[in-house]
UniProtKB/Swiss-Prot annotation:
NADP(+) binds at residues 156-158, 183, 224. It comes from Kosmotoga olearia (strain ATCC BAA-1733 / DSM 21960 / TBF 19.5.1). The gene is folD. This is Bifunctional protein FolD. InterPro entries: Aminoacid_DH-like_N_sf, NAD(P)-bd_dom_sf, THF_DH/CycHdrlase, THF_DH/CycHdrlase_cat_dom, THF_DH/CycHdrlase_NAD-bd_dom. One of its GO terms (cellular component) is cytosol. It comes from the Bacteria. Catalyzes the oxidation of 5,10-methylenetetrahydrofolate to 5,10-methenyltetrahydrofolate and then the hydrolysis of 5,10-methenyltetrahydrofolate to 10-formyltetrahydrofolate. It catalyses: (6R)-5,10-methylene-5,6,7,8-tetrahydrofolate + NADP(+) = (6R)-5,10-methenyltetrahydrofolate + NADPH; (6R)-5,10-methenyltetrahydrofolate + H2O = (6R)-10-formyltetrahydrofolate + H(+). HAMAP family: THF_DHG_CYH. Disulfide bonds: none annotated. GO terms for molecular function: methenyltetrahydrofolate cyclohydrolase activity; methylenetetrahydrofolate dehydrogenase (NADP+) activity.
């Protein structure tokens, strides 16, 4: 039976940092803005969860609906001394999302989506990494999982998980050997089975089965899928969990740590802003 890499104590640790910072503030913290355009039901649910979490922490979260000139609206948020973080809710309907994201300042890009922040991960500059990628690293650190010299296979090549996570794992001092797989990868099962650490970010329920994993492997399940009315990951948890050394659950794993990382990024951005006031 594998060790459960539970995300709850990791998130709790991060929220404790944030609460300590808030408790020491001499003034009201800046706002977090959720910038959206005709959000669908799943996006609304996600936005509501961020608003709720902000309320629990004592952080004001404001929803801003895109108008006729979203790029100019983002630039105004960049200049606002009352806003420390902006989340651009994907997808932005009837809007050039790349243009809007590129207009956001690096300092307020708490999701690590701007070209500047993504580039900073590659060059080793201080920047905000996409929270899901950072959440994976935070879980591994919390449970003392060393990646040095380990073979890591990441299934998924998105700019929110696969690509930035590979850069974080390749950093000097982390020193993983990383393979990124995708829909065109040949011999996928072979590459997954030989991995010391597997990260699945495919978005397909039950994609990873027990036949695909090694006995001593560590499984990080980034997937969030709705299956038979339940939230499940990419990994067939019931089958795979007894076969591996350690595994993250879904829900209760990477997802809840991702939200905590978002608010940590907001805290960092707020500290910079308050220092300039």
């Amino acid at each position: 039976m594998g060790i459960l890499l539970d995300g709850k104590p990791v998130a709790k640790m991060i929220y404790a940092e944030i609460k300590e910072w808030l408790g020491n503030l001499q003034e009201k913290p800046p706002k977090l803005v959720l910038f959206c355009s005709e959000p669908d039901d799943s996006t609304k649910t996600y936005m509501n969860s961020i608003v709720k979490r902000g309320g629990k922490l004592g952080i004001s979260v404001e929803i801003c609906h895109a108008g006729e000139n979203p790029v100019e609206e983002i630039k105004k948020l960049n200049e606002s001394r009352d806003v420390a973080g902006v989340m651009i809710m994907h997808p932005l309907k009837n809007v050039d999302e790349k243009l809007v994201v590129s207009a956001l300042s690096l300092e307020k890009d708490v999701e690590g989506r701007t070209p500047g922040n993504l580039g900073g991960i590659m060059t080793g500059d201080e920047s905000f990494a996409p929270p899901t990628a950072e959440a994976v690293m935070e879980i591994l650190r919390f449970y003392d999982v060393s990646l040095s010299g380990k073979d890591v296979t990441i299934v998924g090549r998105s700019t929110t998980v696969g690509k930035p996570l590979s850069m974080l794992m390749l950093k000097k001092g982390i020193d993983a050997t990383v393979t990124i797989c995708h829909s065109r990868t040949k011999n996928l099962v072979e590459k997954i089975k030989r991995a010391n650490v597997l990260v699945s970010a495919v978005g397909r329920a039950g994609f990873i089965t027990k036949e695909m994993v090694g006995k001593d492997s560590i499984i990080i399940d980034v997937g969030i899928n709705l299956y038979d009315g339940k939230i499940v990951g990419d990994v067939d948890f019931e089958q795979v969990e007894p076969e591996v050394a350690a595994i993250t659950p879904v829900p209760g794993g990477v997802g809840i740590v991702t939200t905590a990382i978002l608010f940590r990024h907001f805290m960092v951005s707020s500290r910079r802003m308050v220092g300039r006031r």
